[in-house]
Structure formats: C-alpha cells, structure tokens
Amino acid sequence: MLFRSIINIIDQRVKNITPYFTSYTLSKSALYTLTKSLSVFLAPKIRVNGISPGPTLKSKNQTQKQFDNQVQRTPLKKQVRLEEINNAIDYLIENKSVTGEVLTLDSGQSLGWANSKSKVFSTD
C-alpha cells in the first residue's frame, strides 16, 4: 500500500503569541489546527504533520542586527539552519507511525524565556 505524507510549514508563533503579527499568527494557527484535523480525517492513507521553525532567515522587515538580537534571545542562542529543517522533514517522511505532530525547531524561542520580565535567579 502506498502511503502519502503532507508536511505543513507553520511557525513557532502559534506557541509564542505576540500582538505584532496578528493576521500572520491567525493564519498559521489555522494551519496548525488544519494539520491536526487532517491527520485524523485522511488517515490511514495520508499522514499529516507540520514543522514550526523559529529564527531561520532574516525577514525583509528586519535589519541584520535585529535578526541577530532575535537569535540571541533564544535559549540556545543559535539560528535554525535550513539543513535542520530538512532533517526534520526527512524524519517525518521516513517515520510511518508519525501523524498529527508539529515539530518545533526554534532554538527554544517558543518557550518565551527571553520575554519574561522577571529575573528568577542569577546565572552568573
């Protein structure tokens, strides 16, 4: 039996909501929900999963300094490489038991740690 796979590119913003990207976040949240719904509706012949990347490429609305700052505010302090996204897509294609999952590759950006206004403890 031939199995097919759909992989949607979502965004970590569905987990890390800000008031600055309302329409974008709304559309990606809808795609997130569609991914979950279709994974049930299209099973068992078609598997549906998603990837939610974080800071990968500089936006046309960002300066390089702003993008670098965004990357430095993630817990891992690293840019998500396209190769890492490709590897995640390969994982979702190859593993026939995975459906309805959304993998977040964002260096921890969706955890919102850098956005916290309170300092809980010193790391010095």
Name each model feature, range by range.
Residues K78-L105, S110, S116-K117:
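C-terminal substrate-recognition "lid" of short-chain dehydrogenase/reductases
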Residues P19, S27, N49, K77-K78:
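Short alpha-helix in the Rossmann-fold core of NAD(P)-dependent oxidoreductases
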Residues K65-E84:
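Catalytic Tyr-x(3-8)-Lys segment
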Residues M1, A43, P75, S97:
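Short conserved AdoMet
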Residues Y32, L42-T56, V98-L105:
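Conserved Rossmann-fold SDR core element
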Residues S116-D124:
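A short alpha/beta connector and helix-capping loop motif
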Residues G50-K65, A114:
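Short beta-loop-alpha junction of Rossmann-like oxidoreductase domains
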Residues F3-A30, T35-A43, P55:
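Catalytic loop of short-chain dehydrogenase/reductase
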